[in-house]
Amino acid sequence: MSEENVQEFVLKEDCELRFAAGDDSDVCLELVKGYAEIFGTELLLNKKYTFPAKSRVAAFTWKGATIELVGTTESAYVAESTPMVIYLNIHAAMEEVRKKREEQAAGNSNKAKGPRLLLVGPTDVGKTTVSRILCNYSVRQGRTPIFVELDVGQNSVSVPGTVAAVLVQKTADVIDGFERNQPIVFNFGHTSPSANLSLYEALFKEMATTLNAQIQENDEAKIGGMIINTCGWVDGEGYKCIVKAASAFEVDVVIVLDHERLYSDLSKELPEFVRLTHVPKSGGVEQRTGQIRSKMRGENVHRYFYGTRANNLYPFTFDVSFDDVTLCKIGAEQLPDSCLPFGMEVENHETKLVIMEPSADIKHHLFAFSRSTKADENVLKSPVFGFCLVTEVDLEKRTMSILCPQRTIPSKVLVFSDITHLDDQIKR
C-alpha cells in the first residue's frame, strides 16, 4: 500500500481509536506499543489484523498504546470520552454477584446460578457491542456465560429471523466475533417481532426453558450467567416483549442504553429485585439505514453458508424431491368468528402449523431443518438443526435445488422462513 495510507495514533490511557474502513479497501491494524482491546478482546502486540471494507472498529486502551493503520479509511480519530469504565463496572458487579452466590452455595448440591443481564434500548445504541464486551470480560475472568440473541433482525449468533443462544467459552475473534459452535437456534422466520408477536413470545419463552434445563447439567454455564441482547423495538408491543423476556429469563439486571423514558417505565414495571441501570451510548455508534441493515442480513446469511476469510466453509448444492420432505410454516390467516361452528373458540392463528404446497414462490427463501420428526405442534417447540437455501424450483419434476451446509438433509421437516437471499457464489 502507498505511504500516504499509513497512519499512526498515540493513545493516552482510557482513550479509544475509532475508524471506518473505506468502501473498497481493507484496513490493517497493528498494535505497535502498549495495550489495547477491541470490544473486549485483547490485541496481540505486533500482530496485523486485517478488517474488510466498510468495517466500523473501536480499539480501546486502559494504559496507553500506539496503533498503526494501513489502508484507506473513511474516518479515523481518537476519542478521549468513552463509556468503557461503565461497562467494566457492570462486569465487576456481575462477577461480585457470582462470587457471593458461589460462597452461599458452598457445599450445596444445588450449584449457584450466575447473574442474568438483559440489554435493552432503541436501534443503533450499541447493544450488540456491549453484549460482546461483557461476554469477553466474563471469559477473561474465567467464566463461561451464555449469550442469548433475541434480535431477529440483526442476529449475531445465527441467520436473521432466529432466536439463538451460544455458550461463550473463549473471547471473540477480533474480526469475526464469537465462534458459533453448537448454538441453540429457534426459527422465527421474520426480521421483526411485529410480524408475529405470539410466535416471538413463544420462542423466547421456549429458549428460556431450554437453557434452564441445560444449565442444570453444566455448573460452569450456570454460574457464568446469561447476557441477553434484544431488538430495538421499545414502544407499545415491543415494550411488552421486553418485560415478558425479563420475566421468562428470570433476569436480575437490566441495562437500558440511551433511553431515559424506557428506563423510567421499566423502573415502575419490573420487580424490585431487578437491578436497573441507565447507560449512555458510545459516541462511536452510528445510525444504520434500512439499506445497510438489509446488506448486513445478506452478509450474515452468506457467512452461515460460506464462512469467513479466516474460516472458509464449503456448502453443498443438490436436489431434493418434494415427495421426500414436508414443507410447513408457522402462522396462518385468521378466520373470522362467523366462519366457525357455533360455540367454537378461535385458536391462535399466529402459532398454527400449516403444511405448504410446493410453489415457485419459495425460491431464494431459507428453510429451517426442524428437530421434530413430524410436522406437528412439536415443530414450534423444537430448536432447529440448521438451514438451507432454496436456489431453484422445478414444479414439473417436483424437485428443488438447495444450498446446504451438510451433504444430506438432517431432517425431512422443513420450516419456511420469510428471509430471502440471492446466492451469488462469491466469497466475501
From Swiss-Prot:
A Pfam family of this chain: CLP1_P
One GO CC annotation: mRNA cleavage factor complex
GO biological process: mRNA 3'-end processing; tRNA splicing, via endonucleolytic cleavage and ligation
Residues engaged in binding ATP: E16, R56, D124, V125, G126, K127, T128, T129
Superkingdom of source: Eukaryota
Record's signal peptide: none
Gene Ontology molecular-function annotations: ATP binding; ATP-dependent polyribonucleotide 5'-hydroxyl-kinase activity; polynucleotide 5'-hydroxyl-kinase activity
Locations listed in the record: Nucleus
Keywords of this entry: ATP-binding, mRNA processing, Nucleotide-binding, Nucleus
PANTHER family linked: CLEAVAGE/POLYADENYLATION FACTOR IA SUBUNIT CLP1P (PTHR12755), POLYRIBONUCLEOTIDE 5'-HYDROXYL-KINASE CLP1 (PTHR12755:SF6)
UniProt family annotation: Belongs to the Clp1 family. Clp1 subfamily.
HAMAP family linked: Clp1
Role of this protein: Required for endonucleolytic cleavage during polyadenylation-dependent pre-mRNA 3'-end formation.
Name under which the protein is recorded: Protein clpf-1
Organism: Caenorhabditis elegans
Gene name of this polypeptide: clpf-1
